[in-house]
Amino acid sequence: DLAKHIGELLYFNDCVTIPGFGSFLLEKKDASYNESNNLYSPPTKSLSFNQKLQSNDGVLALHLSKVLGLSYEKSVIEIHKLVMNWNEKLKISKLNLSKIGELSLNDEGAILFNPKKNINYLIDSYALKPVNAELINRSDLEKTENMPVYFTVNKNNPVKLFRYAASF
């Protein structure tokens, strides 16, 4: 399954090109806060597809040759066969790439891409989940800040106090 190999490569490359078809691109997004549901989301990489980037950069073919034990040339031929298959499927229906997303054709024949939402290709954010943050009522904090704080000093034995402080 080529989609599985593309998904693996996306964890380590910001661009994975399928020669003669297009490229999957990653863009880093900072952590974000959604005010409507008080949710902090970790940093992520958003996935997009560019049909115009079709030149073979060798990344996918080299990966396939290493993983499947094929020659580089044989890997390029296998990718070409699969691209032909994908193009035929797209003419009829949508193409679902597991762990990547869904591809379809628009009326002009351009490829549209709908990425899977639950996959974060940013390794630094591995296992981080969105965090719900409750709103803090500032008026309650202001009330407690105005309360005086009293300290009592033991005047009877100041030497013990200094010994205690010096022990730290």
Model-predicted regions and their roles:
Residues 1-146:
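Cytosolic/nucleoplasmic/matrix-facing N-terminal domains/tails
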Residues 154-168:
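Internal signal-anchor transmembrane helix that establishes type II topology
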Residues 146-153:
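Long, low-complexity intrinsically disordered regions
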